């Protein structure tokens, strides 16, 4: 995911707000979590394109375990609006601090990268920009419009912040007509004060519901991490809340602790439990479920979009 400002190079300064916290041990990952180090020529080529365009990827910033697989298939997700977030979530490895000014040239450069990489599907995300009057909504829209001009065959997925206290911001993004609107709940409501203190659970639910009210043709999507100390019944209730908001697609993945200063992993959830959540989600009415220890919001996003389209077509066919 992409921005064109200079990267944060001093990792010790990435999370100044966490410096006072005691270290917590980082648990050894189970075998089902481990992935191979990236070595393919296509991975190196993708890495070169990212560097040539002076882009910063959330794949790197967030320490995503799937970077080798995704970049080897030339899949990329771009992070706009800088690399410094105004919030300090306990799970996230993206740098926290005072962001730089918005780069007005960024939409065109992101679109150029999408066109050059010949992406069939692209994910656009951002850091939280509580410092901006619209939370960065207009910039999201400009990126979408730029991609439509330079890569008209590419389908577009946005993964947005919550635009809390930003009246009219959501409407700006929806009016730009992304194909998929994703906003992650991240965790169950009982964990928000500790894990996602700057957000409000039911505000996020309402945001997703409002997207469907504004434009029913846009697929809606949300995801959570497990292993933060949540209970199974809380996850099932969260699924019901998402379905009440008419969300089409849900992702569930294992939380991995970025550093000793971040929220500890309470539990590594075994693969069979993820499979169980996927089956339950389908019964509850989601068009698609991606539930796997290594599942992340943008993982296999292009393939998932094709599945969503097919599932919706089949659903409408049955209703005729």
From Swiss-Prot:
Binding site for [4Fe-4S] cluster 2: 85, 89, 92
Positions of [4Fe-4S] cluster 1 binding: 59, 64, 70, 298
Key words of the record: 4Fe-4S, Cytoplasm, Iron, Iron-sulfur, Metal-binding, S-adenosyl-L-methionine, Transferase
Cofactor or coenzyme needed: [4Fe-4S] cluster
Catalytic activity: [[Fe-S] cluster scaffold protein carrying a second [4Fe-4S](2+) cluster] + N(6)-octanoyl-L-lysyl-[protein] + 2 oxidized [2Fe-2S]-[ferredoxin] + 2 S-adenosyl-L-methionine + 4 H(+) = [[Fe-S] cluster scaffold protein] + N(6)-[(R)-dihydrolipoyl]-L-lysyl-[protein] + 4 Fe(3+) + 2 hydrogen sulfide + 2 5'-deoxyadenosine + 2 L-methionine + 2 reduced [2Fe-2S]-[ferredoxin]
Disordered as annotated region, ranges: 1-29
Biased composition (Basic and acidic residues): 19-29
Residues annotated as domain Radical SAM core: 71-287
InterPro entries linked: Aldolase_TIM (IPR013785), Elp3/MiaA/NifB-like_rSAM (IPR006638), Lipoyl_synth (IPR003698), rSAM (IPR007197)
Pathway: Protein modification; protein lipoylation via endogenous pathway; protein N(6)-(lipoyl)lysine from octanoyl-[acyl-carrier-protein]: step 2/2
GO cellular component: cytoplasm
EC number: 2.8.1.8
A single GO molecular function term of this UniProt record: lipoate synthase activity
Enzyme class: transferase
Coiled-coil segments: none
Cofactor: binding details: Binds 2 [4Fe-4S] clusters per subunit. One cluster is coordinated with 3 cysteines and an exchangeable S-adenosyl-L-methionine.
UniProt entry tagged with the keyword Metal-binding: yes
Subcellular location: Cytoplasm
SUPFAM superfamilies in alphabetical order: Radical SAM enzymes
Family in the record: Belongs to the radical SAM superfamily. Lipoyl synthase family.
Protein name: Lipoyl synthase
Gene: lipA
């Amino acid at each position: 995911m992409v921005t064109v400002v200079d990267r944060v190079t001093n990792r010790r300064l990435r999370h100044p707000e966490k410096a006072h916290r005691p270290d917590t041990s980082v648990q050894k990952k189970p075998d089902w979590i481990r992935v191979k180090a990236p070595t393919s020529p296509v991975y190196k080529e993708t890495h070169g394109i990212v560097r040539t365009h002076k882009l910063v990827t959330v794949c790197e910033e967030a320490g995503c375990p799937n970077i080798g697989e995704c970049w080897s298939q030339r899949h990329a997700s771009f992070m706009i609006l800088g690399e410094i977030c105004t919030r300090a979530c306990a799970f996230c490895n993206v740098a926290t601090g005072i962001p730089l000014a918005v780069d007005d040239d960024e939409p065109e450069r992101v679109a150029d990268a999408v066109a050059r990489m010949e992406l069939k599907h692209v994910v656009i995300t951002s850091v939280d920009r509580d410092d901006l009057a619209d939370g960065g909504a207009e910039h999201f829209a400009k990126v979408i419009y730029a991609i439509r001009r330079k890569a008209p065959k590419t389908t577009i997925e946005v993964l947005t912040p919550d635009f809390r206290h930003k009246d009219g911001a959501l409407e700006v993004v929806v009016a730009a007509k992304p194909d998929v609107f994703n906003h992650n709940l991240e965790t169950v409501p009982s964990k928000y004060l500790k894990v996602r203190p700057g957000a409000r659970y039911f505000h996020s639910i309402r945001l997703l519901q409002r997207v469907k009210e504004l434009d029913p043709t846009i697929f809606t999507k949300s995801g959570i991490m497990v292993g933060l100390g949540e209970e199974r019944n809380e996850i099932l209730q969260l699924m019901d809340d998402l379905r009440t908001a008419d969300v089409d697609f849900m992702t569930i993945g294992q939380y991995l602790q970025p550093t000793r200063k971040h929220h500890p992993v309470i539990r590594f959830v075994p693969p069979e439990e993820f499979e169980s959540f996927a089956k339950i989600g389908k019964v509850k009415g989601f068009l698609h479920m991606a539930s796997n220890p290594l599942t992340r919001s943008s993982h296999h996003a292009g393939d998932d979009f094709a599945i969503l389209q097919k599932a919706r077509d089949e659903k409408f066919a049955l209703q005729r």
